């Protein structure tokens, strides 16, 4: 049982780690707006560097043998490749594409619709029974999304339709990522699966947009710092801090505190980039956050929290 001091340390780690995830989306938006960096290049570099660094850290630890052992299991190897290309790359590309065509605040909140998609999938496949919490979550999700995208006016979208499409695809990709990776994570652990998933996704994207295909001659300190922040803080360190928090907190607690990610994305977008965020949009964002709380409080909270843990660590 963790001491009070350890629990406070866990709270700090999960809140700061999730905030780094949220801030990385805002930094990516700033990068897209102020430079010629493309979504494809950033996805390639983010996944390649983060994956390599994470696998290097694992190789330096006690679990170094598992880095290559996973490839000796044919079933796991095939699952890992599918996870890396469809899951990891799918989530990263659609999320950053939504930011590139819209803004980080809306993209992050749309991606948080993934738990609702998971609930719907479970209901359709009859793996879960329908509960009152599911109805409440669906109503909150639909109402929150409507307010977020329209700011209360059905005639106007707050972001481009393309950004909405990418955002919804991001939520769908994240739902697949969460469900598909479950058996891999149980067998091999989060760090190893995520590390290889990132590297595989980065290699796959590299065939479309190689990491060296970028003009850095006009780059300033701002561009270099932005890319470094996205890779180190927004991906690697955020992931490490979240996993560390699970040593001292219950998964359900970490899951709830992980909601500081969209809060950080919205706040930084408004305060730093001057993104317009109306009263109705704020109400919509609140609905989505309440939806996450409702789902985490279901009787199957243990399983839901585990799924939410897998959902969070992709960023």
Each language-model region and where it sits:
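C-terminal-most transmembrane helix of multi-pass membrane proteins
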Residues: 47, 128, 150-151, 223-225, ...
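Specific transmembrane alpha-helical segments of multi-pass solute transporters/efflux pumps
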Residues: 62-105, 147, 231-249
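Loop-to-transmembrane alpha-helix entry segments
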Residues: 111, 124-147, 157-164, 220, ...
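Alpha-helical transmembrane segments of compact multi-pass small-molecule transporters, enriched
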Residues: 49, 53, 110-124, 139-140, ...
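Membrane-interface helix-cap regions at the ends of transmembrane helices
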Residues: 2-3, 30, 50-73, 120, ...
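Hydrophobic alpha-helical transmembrane segments of multi-pass integral membrane proteins
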Residues: 8-13, 40-60, 82, 137-143, ...
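Helix-helix packing/entry segments at the starts of transmembrane helices
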Residues: 18, 45, 88, 92, ...
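Glycine-/small-residue-enriched transmembrane alpha-helix faces in small-molecule transporters
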Residues: 1-44, 156-183, 203, 307-315
